[in-house]
Amino acid sequence: METEGLSPMLYEDDYYYGNETGLQPCDETDWDFSYSLLPVFYMIVFVLGLSGNGVVIFTVWKSKPKRRSADTYIGNLALADLAFVVTLPLWATYTALGFHWPFGSALCKLSSYLVLLNMFASVFCLTCLSFDRYLAIVHSLSSAKLRSRSSIIVSLAVIWLFSGLLALPSLILRDTRVEGNNTICDLDFSGVSSKENENFWIGGLSILTTVPGFLLPLLLMTIFYCFIGGKVTMHFQNLKKEEQKKKRLLKIIITLVVVFAICWLPFHILKTIHFLDLMGFLELSCSTQNIIVSLHPYATCLAYVNSCLNPFLYAFFDLRFRSQCFFFFGFKKVLQGHLSNTSSSLSAQTQKSEIHSLATKV
């Protein structure tokens, strides 16, 4: 199936790429394989993301009396991911139909907006969660006001407001139009720019997604976790009985940052290369363009996978949160066995330290 007039670089899951802009005329990429494979990926992410984030939201909601500051950020992170994954059946259908959008203009705008809203809100929640853990571990005594309930509410309000504003271009500019035999969901700059200046709009929107949506959060999270790792190492260096706990904490910290980078880095690298080509800083051959075009949808899928990994990375690695999940879903025997195994392997002093850590540090 051909996509007449549709630049493959516009692969519709990159919500800020423009149509047929900045690319030299090249042979079209064969999308037949992607039309079959990508919808399957989308639906797998949909099922895992819907169930995983749903469990997180339910658990956070049920544990309100004992909710920690980290739990509040985890719940909002899950809400942001959930708002995105519910749109995946639409994008799966769109791809399976060969980039034909049968759902109308309103859903085109709303679905595109939710994707960008998720990207920003999710990244900002992760950054605030990292900052909260940094304060709890590195400045546990002096950060009480910054980690108070009112401060968390204000920070969440800022997260959602800022995310909503950054995602507005998608809501305003995205619309449906007929392209050959297909109706596509695409960015339309005709109301704000001439055809000659579209590249500048696309370049600006590309920077808008990459800098505040990836580079700055990744830099901040790396800094926070470096301080956390240093503090944990100093705290446990003379406590041999805590050696395994130290290694576990450091492993989780490293995993959080690495998984985030792995999921999003390929997407932003390809988008940056396209931006540099668009603005004339690079002159890519047709073969190079075709490689980028072929890799781009799968880099996008990898970024989407982060929405179904987050519940496991940021919630189920947490002993206290995992215990709450078992309790609220009626797995009391599993919980009792888990606590029994934990008790048999820890000394009384270590248990006391563990309980204190779970209650105040994470």
UniProtKB/Swiss-Prot annotation:
Q: Give GO MF terms, alphabetically.
A: apelin receptor activity; C-C chemokine binding; C-C chemokine receptor activity; mechanoreceptor activity
Lineage, top ranks: Eukaryota, Metazoa, Chordata, Craniata, Vertebrata
The protein's name in its UniProt record: Apelin receptor A
Residues assigned to the Extracellular compartment are: 1-37, 98-110, 173-199, 270-296
Against Gene3D superfamilies, the record matches this protein to: Rhodopsin 7-helix transmembrane proteins (1.20.1070.10)
State a GO cellular component annotated for this protein.
plasma membrane
Q: Which cysteines are joined by disulfide bonds?
A: C26-C286, C108-C185
Transmembrane stretches in the record are 38-58, 77-97, 111-131, 152-172, 200-220, 249-269, 297-317
Name the UniProt key words of this record, in alphabetical order. Angiogenesis, Cell membrane, Developmental protein, Differentiation, Disulfide bond, G-protein coupled receptor, Gastrulation, Glycoprotein, Membrane, Receptor, Transducer, Transmembrane, Transmembrane helix
Q: According to its UniProt record, in which tissues is this protein expressed?
A: Expressed in all blood vessels including the posterior cardinal vein, intersomitic veins and the vitelline vein network. At the gastrula stage, exclusively expressed in the mesodermal layer and at the neurula stage in the lateral plate mesoderm. Larval expression is observed in the endothelium of the primary blood vessels and the forming heart.
UniProt topology in membrane: Multi-pass membrane protein
Name the gene behind this protein: aplnr-a
Pfam families cross-referenced by the UniProt entry: 7tm_1
- What organism is recorded for this protein? Xenopus laevis
The source's superkingdom equals Eukaryota
